[in-house]
Design a protein with these regions (language model features):
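Extended, structured polyanion-binding interfaces
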Residues: 1-164
Length: 164
């Protein structure tokens, strides 16, 4: 069904190529990595376009309670670091995924090939496993896909081919 959304409905634009691999995690659940290469006319060339597709913030629960609950359920990293030094993502006293991320008032290009998503310091906090967390802990997601599939779907935009 995800392939239908991406390849047939082309929710992110016309697709030139799609490559994916399905892995099985330690506990037997399927886990997919999928790379979409968009055609020239559909490429996301600036941070304003990134923000139309990817979000890395907690939705306002008064405006969209359902989406907020899905983000809390599926798209919060950890907690790790000082909040949980025993988290599986910890390597040498640091999170291997670099959480918590820095606050940022806008989306921009990162030093590597990933975008740095808007994570505003808006004072909004949520409670997850006895910890108060904010936008620094939100994994990038697409609101439409998160609501449609009700599961963890980490969505990242690469601005170069350095990682491929």
């Amino acid at each position: 069904m995800l392939k239908v959304e991406l390849l047939k409905k082309q929710i992110f634009g016309e697709v030139a190529a799609c490559v994916y691999v399905i892995e099985f995690q330690k506990w037997g659940f399927q886990h997919a990595h999928l790379l979409l290469i968009l055609k020239s006319g559909s490429k996301l060339l600036n941070p304003e376009l990134y923000d139309r597709i990817v979000c890395a913030e907690i939705p306002n629960p008064e405006k969209n309670r359902h989406l907020c609950s899905l983000v809390i359920k599926h798209m919060i990293h950890g907690p790790c670091g000082d909040k949980n030094k025993q988290s599986p993502c910890m390597r040498g006293g640091r999170c291997k995924n670099n959480y918590p991320k820095n606050f940022s008032p806008y989306t921009g290009h990162g030093e590597d090939s990933y975008a740095c998503y808007r994570k505003r310091d808006d004072g909004q906090k949520i409670r997850v496993r006895k910890h108060e967390l904010d936008n620094q802990w939100v994994i990038p997601y697409n609101p439409y896909l998160l609501a449609l599939f009700d599961c963890h779907i980490n969505l990242e935009i690469w601005s170069t081919f350095m990682r491929v």
